Amino acid sequence: MIKLNMSDVISVLNMCKPYLIAIAVILVVGIVAAVMCKKMENPKRKLVRGNAILAMVLGVVIVANLICAGPMSTLLTLSTQAAETVSDETTEQSNEDCRTIAAEGTVLLENDGILPLKDTKNINVFGWASVNPIYGGSGAGALNDLYDRVTMLEGLEDAGFKLNGELTDLYTNYGKERADYGSDWSLPEVPAEDYSDELIENAKEFSDTAIVTIARWGGEGSDLPTDMSSVSYTNNSDSYNDFETGQHYLELSQTEKNMINLVCENFEHVILVYDGLSTFELGFVEDYPQIEGILWCAGPGQTGFDSLGKIISGEVNPSGKTSDTFLYDLTETPTWNNFGDFKYDNMEEFKIDESDPYVGGSVPTFVNYVEGIYVGYRFYETAAQEGAIDYDKTVQYPFGYGLSY
């Protein structure tokens, strides 16, 4: 079924406005001519009226053709031409390119000898994100639902690993879905108290190796919350808040902290997989000697999780480098303290029409880059050189950092 967006309809009408005015003028002139000949004698009256009607019809047809050949040309062509399909060969090539990009882009942040898992085939995968991973961002970074996706768990299984089905069932049956980006910032995660003693004991018998998954969304259209208490989200438990006032989206929720505590108390060898589209405060890993490996798999697309499995198994040697700087405390950065939606004065004349479904009522805004040319890694390198910061206490993983096997 075709769905109409009123803003699109209004836009099309505005494009056709001069032509529609011409049609209206033609109709008015024709009607006036037909009325004016009312007092004429019958044969002459019929002739004038007939010619007036003929002229009206001809004029409307000409203008309608001008509309079709002019402002409506592209729209009519796209809506009437035969639908083109993507060939199986093109789809498979695209999937293979996605695997290659993920294989070359996944970053090995830490490795205390745990990776690759050459002799380990059984893995306990913890975290709700394991069954609801982040595949991509928003806008141009979003995915097409017409094509199948390789899930994180499928990628691990395709690499030859056997996964703990009890954990998978726990997360699948948790009964929550990932909220729409920008409207709800909930981070579903099973509370630690919902892991039964029997489930944990079975997991320990299954394997002494665990993967913990953490995921964060991001993309155009919505800034990530700098204070979770000021946005809409749902706590995972009635006994505590996932975030206190002032805590932000790019740090662990309380439920995630509890899960990591639970895993590290029960398993000797832990790998953290961060499936996120922005850098994250990962300083907590230094409190857990059990976390021996960290991988940053940033939105791997339709089939990229195949490569994650191959990296963990050792079939692929990770070679990705960080595209941004990982910091211990994001709140102490120039970016954090200076980004925003700052409005210029006297910009009402440039205000976007309220009918626009995406940015209706918006006016041009700006960001004040107070650090000048020292944006990103340049700031930390320069500030450390000048003695303004302690680099090692500020930067956890620098821009361009990444390990390999």
Feature locations, PLM:
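C-terminal non-catalytic regions of proteins with extracellular/luminal or membrane-system context
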Residues: M1-Y405
